[in-house]
Amino acid sequence: DAPRISGMHFGPDGRIYSCQGGSFGRIVAFDLKAGEMEVIAENVRPNDLVVTSDGHVYFTETAKMQISHIPPGGSVQAADVASKTDGPQRPNGIALTPDQGTLAVSDYGGRHTWVWRIGKNGGLDLRQSYITLRTPSPDLPSKGDGMTTDGVGRYYVTSAVGLQMFDPTGRMGGVIAAPTNKPIVSVTFAGPGHQYIYVAAGDEIFRRRTKASGVEAVRPQSKSK
């Protein structure tokens, strides 16, 4: 039993990497076959995470206005920290583009989703506000939360007005209303052909078949015999 899990992503080693928030404040990895959990990082305040195909872990620390990075075999480092006038004020959801060259982060307390280019060593640069989210009214934040991308690079961001969709250039493609009066907070593609989009709202999970296909989870690296 592992309480306060908020973000989950398969790593190249086949384990599920997760944020464990609250008083735990750590990043953990679950080996489902062995039934074991390893603590990857402690004394952090994680919200959501992604893992690249070569083992870099990126996670949002909302309270710190920070994107953090754990390189393979390394320790936690601040990849980017926003100021009160620039960057995501409450970084929340996080996703990779299909080529894993760009990292995107939603801002629960603002109107934008921000992007960074990922360098060869895993560092982040060229931060920019790439997507403008719709809000319930001009004076309210978007409450941008969980997010994902599909196989052609479209962005899907949960928000106060529903699931917002954007093309790879950041242009609005449409909004799917929330299936319940509870806010939707997480989104991912799964199922046959990764053509079903799933959202979490409160204690319920909903799915909808789409014409798009999500990005397949990282495949475990094969071991040489």
How should each PLM-predicted stretch be described?
Residues 1, 35-41, 76-85, 126-138, ...:
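A short beta-strand motif characteristic of beta-propeller blades
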Residues 30-35, 71-75, 117-122, 167-171, ...:
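Short loop/turn segments that connect beta-strands within beta-propeller blades
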Residues 1-20, 24-26, 41-59, 64-66, ...:
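Beta-rich, blade/repeat-based domains predominating
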Residues 95, 101-112, 116, 120:
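Glycine- and Gly-Pro-enriched alpha-helical subdomains that act as flexible
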Residues 110-112, 116-118, 127, 131-171:
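Loop/turn-rich, solvent-exposed surfaces of beta-rich toroidal or solenoidal domains
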